[in-house]
């Protein structure tokens, strides 16, 4: 493995690890506040699955504790979607549906081919299938429930839709469209996956087209069965597509990070 390839593997591991870490923390905020005890257990299990994934991925990029607790906000590479506040229960479910559908499709691809993420993906895809199915069942229940639950679920789907396009931006070290990037491609590309002349490298998809299409098909099917309308707004982040992957985050992320890192930073170098 060349230095360039290793660097890009680390970058991909960091981004995917940050996704899992941040969403795990968000779901953990529900502990003691979930609507029923059964859901308390379900959300805790999903959070723990994601935390386990985060530990493996962050360890591929460096020291897991240092990366989780000692980086500043701009150094995190997670999607803006996963950092969004829990809001009401419908918002949490919509966020989980969008992300778990993407994560399941991604890990299924990674598990099916050789590479540094194949082992993790083979295990994680089974966990994520449960996460996706759990979110799907709640989407159906809320969307096809009372007038109020339908309204809240639709509002949540609409509000989070603009963060979904970022999931399908190119990510160094990952092959999203099945064609792959060789080491020459990696050497001549920018962090956003484009050539240094601003174009997409030959043999790559600038927006993970196949993955995006499969995600849209799956989400549209769930929303349709739930009696919910597919949001029609733009699918870009708060400032620009790919903002979270570039270290640009929404306001609420800074507050979440301060809470998550408080204990570790309060006792630097302590042994636990």
Can you annotate each of these PLM segments?
Residues 47-71, 135-139:
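Conserved alpha-helical segments that form or flank metal/cofactor-binding pockets of metalloenzymes
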Residues 9-13, 34-53, 92, 116-128:
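Alpha-helical scaffold segments that form or flank carboxylate-/histidine-based iron centers
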Residues 19-27, 53, 57, 99-106, ...:
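Amphipathic, well-ordered alpha-helical segments in soluble domains
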Residues 14-19, 63-76, 225:
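Acidic, low-complexity proline/glycine-rich segments
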Residues 2-12, 70-96, 145-146, 160-178, ...:
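Acidic/His metal-coordination segments adjacent to aromatic residues that form catalytic metal sites
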Residues 150-187, 192-272:
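Extended, helix-rich structural scaffolds rather than catalytic motifs
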Residues 81-137:
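Internal, conserved structured core segments that host functional sites
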Residues 23-45, 102-118:
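Helix-loop segments that flank and shape redox-cofactor active sites
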């Amino acid at each position: 493995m060349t230095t360039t390839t290793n660097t890009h593997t680390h970058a991909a591991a960091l981004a995917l690890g940050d996704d899992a870490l941040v969403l795990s923390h968000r779901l953990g905020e529900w502990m003691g506040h979930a609507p029923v005890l059964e859901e308390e257990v379900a959300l805790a299990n999903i959070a723990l699955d994601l935390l386990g994934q985060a530990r493996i991925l962050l360890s591929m990029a460096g020291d897991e504790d240092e990366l989780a607790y000692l980086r500043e906000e701009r150094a995190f590479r997670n999607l803006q979607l996963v950092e969004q506040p829990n809001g009401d229960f419908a918002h949490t479910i919509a966020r989980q549906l969008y992300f778990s559908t993407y994560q399941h499709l991604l890990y299924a691809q990674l598990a099916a081919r050789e590479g540094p993420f194949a082992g993790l993906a083979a295990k994680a895809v089974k966990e994520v299938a449960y996460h996706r199915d759990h979110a799907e069942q709640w989407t159906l229940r809320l969307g096809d429930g009372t007038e109020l639950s339908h309204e809240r679920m639709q509002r949540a789907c609409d509000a989070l839709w603009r963060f979904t396009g970022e999931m399908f931006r190119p990510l160094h070290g990952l092959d999203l469209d099945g064609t792959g990037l060789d080491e020459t491609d990696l050497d001549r590309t920018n962090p956003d996956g484009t050539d240094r002349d601003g174009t997409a490298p030959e043999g790559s998809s600038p927006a993970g087209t196949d993955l995006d299409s499969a995600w849209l098909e799956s989400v549209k099917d769930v929303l349709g069965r739930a009696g919910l309308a597919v949001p029609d707004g733009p699918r870009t982040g708060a400032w620009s597509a790919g903002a979270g992957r570039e270290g640009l985050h929404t306001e609420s992320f800074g507050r979440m990070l301060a809470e998550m890192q408080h204990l570790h930073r309060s006792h630097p170098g302590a042994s636990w």
